[in-house]
């Protein structure tokens, strides 16, 4: 009798796991596995958007370079000593504009493979940091070129009576239209560069 009581007293009741507990553990495991995949998918989506923006910026920079670099107009009338002609290389500001946008176009072409690497390997931060630094440099470069050219285009359209600079766009209409279009395209490229910098900074911050 005593042995029976001692056996009952020393028996340990091990509670069985309920089905709800097993379900919670399974859900937690699934969430732990799904979270990295979700973050990776989000980063890949940001990298794809970055690639698309670079193509758009490349198109804008190339348009600005080609338009300004081929701007040349000669008026149909001339005198014995003068021929009225306007070309982009008559002004150093426009020459700098063409060079700056050509450099921006070349950089964008070279940055596309790095952007593809960021798509394939979205967790790599070195490539994103490099692009962020170079994009910031190109923001300043393209903005300076576009702003300086915009000042010259404004003078071509309106002149400046205080300095006796006359507006020439009434005579050189095609010249002014092409230079104005090139400046607009360059500002678009600069705006896309700014957006790329913000996008890269946000992506690195979330990493």
UniProtKB/Swiss-Prot annotation:
Alphabetical list of InterPro entries matching this protein: CASP/CASPL (IPR006459), CASP_dom (IPR006702), CASPL (IPR044173)
Transmembrane segments: 46-66, 96-116, 129-149, 182-202
Localization: Cell membrane
Keywords, in A-Z order: Cell membrane, Cell wall biogenesis/degradation, Membrane, Transmembrane, Transmembrane helix
Domain of life, per lineage: Eukaryota
Family to which the UniProt record says this protein belongs: Belongs to the Casparian strip membrane proteins (CASP) family.
Descriptive protein name: Casparian strip membrane protein 3
Naturally occurring in which organism (per UniProt): Erythranthe guttata
